Amino acid sequence: MSTPAATTDPVVERTTANSSTSAALVVSRARVSYPDGPDIRVVLDDLELSVEPGEIVVISGESGAGKSTLLTVAGLLRRPDEGEVTIAGIATSEMSERQRTAVRREHLAFVYQSANLLPSLTAVEQLELVGHIRKERGTAVRERALATLASVDLTDRANQLPSQLSGGERQRVGIARALMASPSVLIADEPTASLDPERAAIVAGLLADAARTHRIATIVVAHDTAALVHADRHLRLEGGRLRPM
């Protein structure tokens, strides 16, 4: 489902050409620390993570362990103090913020605990907006939006506003919106935490189906069993590093 980078930035082209890894996401020797009174608190400590296309990695950990920090680093929303993040073969540590933003828009998508849908747009219009942002035009945008909604079993809810959808349906629209971006990497932060067990199982299953069907490298921060059922790997963030469970 991933598409080649639209940017012609020479740095992006050079780092893509020089990459030899098959992983869609590589976080290498990432270190992040914060001031903690007179001390320094190390949140990520030479952390390593590699996720292959179509692989689902579930990450858990205690509150304050650094899970959100890891997701912002992997999602190019903040720079690590040290280390490298490579997305779809593109090394990003030496890039400007403009270049990193271009890589993020081309290759990354996010699903959060709350879908944060625009209240005035119907389900299909939420997805069409993504297509328009990606410079897609014409009837093909609506056709792809409808097909993507169908992939999360929302064909009959396409013309409903968020206020007319259940919590589980809104979260499925959020997943469809992420898929509309044709990402190489999908980052999901507690995507089922606000749902009852039945709806959580449905949403987790749809995420897993999308990851494997479209070969999307997927990171899920979660603690519930709904997400763990579909994990290829379950890692725990502890002491600034990821450890297998």
Feature roles, as predicted:
Residues P197-R199:
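Helix N-cap at the start of a conserved alpha-helix in ABC-type nucleotide-binding domains
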Residues S182:
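Conserved catalytic motifs of ABC-family nucleotide-binding domains
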Residues G83-A91:
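Conserved ABC transporter NBD signature motif
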Residues L121-V130:
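Short coil-to-helix segment of the ABC ATPase nucleotide-binding domain corresponding to the Q-loop/switch region
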Residues L186-D189:
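Catalytic Walker B motif of ABC-type/P-loop ATPase nucleotide-binding domains
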Residues L161-L165, E169:
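Conserved ABC ATPase signature
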Residues R41, T92-A109:
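ABC ATPase NBD coupling module
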